[in-house]
Amino acid sequence: MRILLSELCYQRPRDTSLSGPRSTLVWVAVLAVGSIAPLTARACATCGCTVNSDAAMGYAAASGWHLNLEYNYINQDQLRGGTGTASAAGVVNRPSDPTLGGGEIEQATLNRYFDLGLSYRPNANWNINLLVPYIARTHSTYGQQQQPYVPSETTPDQLSYARVAGLGDTRLIASYQGLLPTHYLGLQLGVKLPTGQSGTAVSFHAGSDAGSPLDASLQAGTGSTDLILGAYYYQPVSQDFDAFASAQFQAAVSHRLDQPGDDFRPGNATTLSLGVRDETSAAWVPQLQLNLLHKSADQGDLADRPDTAGFVAYLSPGLTVRALSSLYLYGVVQLPVYSDLSGYQLFPRWTATVGLSYAL
């Protein structure tokens, strides 16, 4: 699962009778886990940027169309298990699935996401957001190694490589925030559609695993139709500071890969984000978020269930800049502060998101 910065649509009501930054700034609240990417069954299933992501892009309550372009960078190059780092020897000699007599030693997964978001707000209460991702991913692994571990199993000639490039799974999310006169409280209902290639669409192109299918959760799509439920709340806490909170739950309600021996269902994911923004200036808005994610294990014969669940926490500083009257630029860096991962998973040391938002 991956949550985009433009997914959670917080609308700050704009009172044109007021003066100062708060009456003129179209704001961007980057909230969620940045990018919780659909990562590998044998890499990190609970990694993100952003992005949000996991994340929220919000505009003042004016109606109209808005375009959002976003780039997310996630380099998973650290092997972790439980709450600490892991080693190749640990993966093989203390495998997450003892029945295998060893484990897969992954090297790295580099993810680059290019996301297009188009939203329409017919009035102050409703917003509809379409999100289309393009995924560029490379993955390298030393493959499955049997006990006991020996250093020759992690020499460069043992590496296999795979590359994924194409459209990912599209999301359509509706937001309603007419519950309060202030429009500070909102609810979300959405769906993720299986538009990306899934299952065994892409195989390793080099190394000893060449020709073998890439892990199902490393493909561009999951093959599942997911239900998305969310809620968010925004509150000014002083003349210059705002606080916000959001929660989102995503679960697969159907999956194409449902045949014996060829089935895959991504695990459910729950995100929670808390943050503050400093709106002293109308030209630039610094912000800080705490992003939490819990993900259950993937299911099915194509899933690596022991290595796909966990809980992670990120601290995410960000900045939004008003470049033109209708154009805003934003950036977020996500720093992991805690992780408790099942099995062994590849994990990023940091992630980054940059984007622009334009009122059409």
PLM segments and residue spans:
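Outer-membrane beta-barrel biogenesis signature
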Residues: 39-93, 182, 194-199
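Extracellular loop and loop/strand-boundary signature of outer-membrane beta-barrel proteins
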Residues: 54-55, 100-104, 154-161, 214-219, ...
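Residues on the lipid-exposed face of transmembrane beta-strands in outer-membrane beta-barrel proteins
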Residues: 55-57, 69-71, 116-120, 130, ...
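Residues that define the transmembrane beta-barrel architecture of outer-membrane proteins
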Residues: 63, 110-114, 156, 164-170, ...
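Repeated loop/turn-to-beta-strand initiation elements of outer-membrane beta-barrel proteins
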Residues: 65, 126-128, 182-185, 240-243, ...
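Transmembrane beta-barrel strands of outer-membrane/channel proteins
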Residues: 67-73, 130-134, 187-193, 245-249, ...
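Outer membrane beta-barrel transmembrane domains
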Residues: 80-82, 86-96, 250-360
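Outer-membrane pore/translocation modules
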Residues: 134-263
